[in-house]
């Protein structure tokens, strides 16, 4: 994509099924650190995320082959009809509130609209009020409560039109 400053950039990522075990482990650690959720390697490798503008990795440094450079990811997949689903969107806490999330979201929205989609759906933890606010600013609203969706508590399903911010 483009360099965002401080040696950090969003790049198109490989399909999760093509991640090496070391990269998959780094993704699992990112989810555990930032979201408090523990997943298995199989749960990552079976995610149906194609290689497209909704599959982005936030990488820091010059050696983007090093899994330790992973600072965030956005994984989205075509869902149904005109809806695209964000399966995962996570950025390390030290890289939040610096515009990286906005940059990824806007790139994703452009790609999804070009792909014929007009709506987005995702799940977010009820305790993740910052994430909910990020999505509300982009026009998403809570549609349903998701009891038991997250191992660590209540979740919400949010949906809205694809909008940049």
Residue spans for each PLM region:
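Conserved hydrophobic beta-strand within the GNAT/NAT acetyltransferase core sheet
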Residues: 86, 120-124
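Acetyl-CoA-dependent GNAT
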Residues: 2-94, 105-107, 111, 115, ...
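Acyl-donor (CoA/ACP) binding surface of acyl/acetyltransferases
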Residues: 94, 102, 147, 156, ...
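Short coil/turn segments at alpha/beta junctions that flank glycine-rich nucleotide-binding fingerprints
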Residues: 98, 115-118
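Conserved glycine-rich acetyl-CoA-binding loop
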Residues: 92-106, 125-133, 137-138
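Conserved catalytic-core motifs of GNAT/GCN5-like acyltransferases
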Residues: 123-124, 136, 141-157
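Positions that flank functional sites
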Residues: 46, 127, 150
């Amino acid at each position: 994509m483009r360099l965002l400053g401080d040696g950090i950039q969003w790049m198109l990522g490989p399909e999760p099924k093509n991640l090496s075990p070391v990269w998959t482990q780094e993704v699992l650690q990112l989810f555990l650190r930032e979201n408090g959720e523990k997943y298995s390697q199989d749960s990552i490798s079976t995610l149906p995320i194609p290689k497209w503008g909704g599959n982005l990795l936030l990488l820091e440094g010059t050696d983007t082959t090093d899994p330790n450079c992973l600072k965030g990811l956005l994984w989205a997949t075509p869902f149904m009809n005109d809806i695209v689903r964000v399966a995962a969107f996570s950025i390390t806490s030290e890289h939040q509130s610096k515009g990286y999330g906005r940059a990824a979201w806007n790139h994703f929205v452009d790609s999804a609209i070009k792909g014929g989609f007009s709506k987005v759906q995702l799940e977010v933890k009820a305790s993740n009020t910052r994430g909910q606010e990020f999505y509300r600013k982009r026009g998403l609203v809570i549609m349903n409560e998701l009891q038991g969706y997250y191992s660590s508590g209540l979740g919400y399903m949010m949906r809205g039109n694809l909008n940049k911010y």
